[in-house]
Amino acid sequence: MKYDRPIIALDFPDKEKTFEFLKKFPEDEKLFVKVGMELFYSEGSDMVKELISEGHDVFLDLKLHDIPNTVKQAMKVIGKLGVKLTTVHISGGSEMLIAAKEGLLDGANGDTNTKILGITQLTSTDEEMVKNEQKLSISLKESVKNYAKIAQKSGLDGVVCSAEESDMIYKLTGDDFLRITPGIRLAGGDVGDQKRVMTPDAAARNHSSGIVVGRAITKAENPLDSYRLVTKLWREK
């Protein structure tokens, strides 16, 4: 499975800045957008509802990580929103992941198109952090592979991973298990605080199911032109 449109990360502090950005696109252009912690904590679920009411698809990226019951109750709320994607940390364990799925279904009365993705390792993580801070005896890629297996076994719909690992997960889990990849940059673009990055066309060749693009579009001189370029590269491989 592959999402046709790049997912634009709306990394803005408030509603005003968000819609100022969205006005740079044609009114009939329906986007796939990601609402993360900053925007959600600033504007709440009303922001999500407004984006959906305007015809946009929403990836609500809150990376839930808590005891199973707390995550289940939070997912009940998310289940009512009608977002396309949402996230939990796989490191919370299989019991938490199963509870997340149950909560989502409960919130949507058993009928939902929302897919839950598990966070493997953040794209800001590198081998040194895995070894010295997380104290894992396996490599970063082996850690990602292990998390992907846990997520699939627990009933999640896919994972968030670096595009460097998407082909590995594709071979491990099959094509129906989603591989959504942030850390996407145009050639020569600023990588910021992300350490594992890739271009849109390379991510497509590496079996990413969907790409999340932030600064390459939101900070561009002409966001619409950048969006068109990213979309072209993503679709053509």
Swiss-Prot record:
<dbReference type="GO" id="GO:0044205">
    <property type="term" value="P:'de novo' UMP biosynthetic process"/>
</dbReference>
<dbReference type="InterPro" id="IPR011060">
    <property type="entry name" value="RibuloseP-bd_barrel"/>
</dbReference>
<comment type="pathway">
    <text>Pyrimidine metabolism; UMP biosynthesis via de novo pathway; UMP from orotate: step 2/2.</text>
</comment>
<keyword id="KW-0456">Lyase</keyword>
<dbReference type="InterPro" id="IPR013785">
    <property type="entry name" value="Aldolase_TIM"/>
</dbReference>
<comment type="similarity">
    <text>Belongs to the OMP decarboxylase family. Type 1 subfamily.</text>
</comment>
<feature type="binding site">
    <location>
        <position position="214"/>
    </location>
    <ligand>
        <name>substrate</name>
    </ligand>
</feature>
<protein>
    <recommendedName>
        <fullName>Orotidine 5'-phosphate decarboxylase</fullName>
        <ecNumber>4.1.1.23</ecNumber>
    </recommendedName>
</protein>
<dbReference type="InterPro" id="IPR001754">
    <property type="entry name" value="OMPdeCOase_dom"/>
</dbReference>
<feature type="binding site">
    <location>
        <position position="123"/>
    </location>
    <ligand>
        <name>substrate</name>
    </ligand>
</feature>
<keyword id="KW-0210">Decarboxylase</keyword>
<comment type="subunit">
    <text>Homodimer.</text>
</comment>
<dbReference type="InterPro" id="IPR014732">
    <property type="entry name" value="OMPdecase"/>
</dbReference>
<dbReference type="InterPro" id="IPR047596">
    <property type="entry name" value="OMPdecase_bac"/>
</dbReference>
<feature type="binding site">
    <location>
        <begin position="61"/>
        <end position="70"/>
    </location>
    <ligand>
        <name>substrate</name>
    </ligand>
</feature>
<feature type="active site" description="Proton donor">
    <location>
        <position position="63"/>
    </location>
</feature>
<dbReference type="GO" id="GO:0004590">
    <property type="term" value="F:orotidine-5'-phosphate decarboxylase activity"/>
</dbReference>
<feature type="binding site">
    <location>
        <position position="194"/>
    </location>
    <ligand>
        <name>substrate</name>
    </ligand>
</feature>
<feature type="binding site">
    <location>
        <position position="34"/>
    </location>
    <ligand>
        <name>substrate</name>
    </ligand>
</feature>
<comment type="function">
    <text>Catalyzes the decarboxylation of orotidine 5'-monophosphate (OMP) to uridine 5'-monophosphate (UMP).</text>
</comment>
<dbReference type="GO" id="GO:0006207">
    <property type="term" value="P:'de novo' pyrimidine nucleobase biosynthetic process"/>
</dbReference>
<dbReference type="GO" id="GO:0005829">
    <property type="term" value="C:cytosol"/>
</dbReference>
<dbReference type="Pfam" id="PF00215">
    <property type="entry name" value="OMPdecase"/>
</dbReference>
<dbReference type="InterPro" id="IPR018089">
    <property type="entry name" value="OMPdecase_AS"/>
</dbReference>
<feature type="binding site">
    <location>
        <position position="215"/>
    </location>
    <ligand>
        <name>substrate</name>
    </ligand>
</feature>
<keyword id="KW-0665">Pyrimidine biosynthesis</keyword>
<feature type="binding site">
    <location>
        <position position="185"/>
    </location>
    <ligand>
        <name>substrate</name>
    </ligand>
</feature>
<feature type="binding site">
    <location>
        <position position="11"/>
    </location>
    <ligand>
        <name>substrate</name>
    </ligand>
</feature>
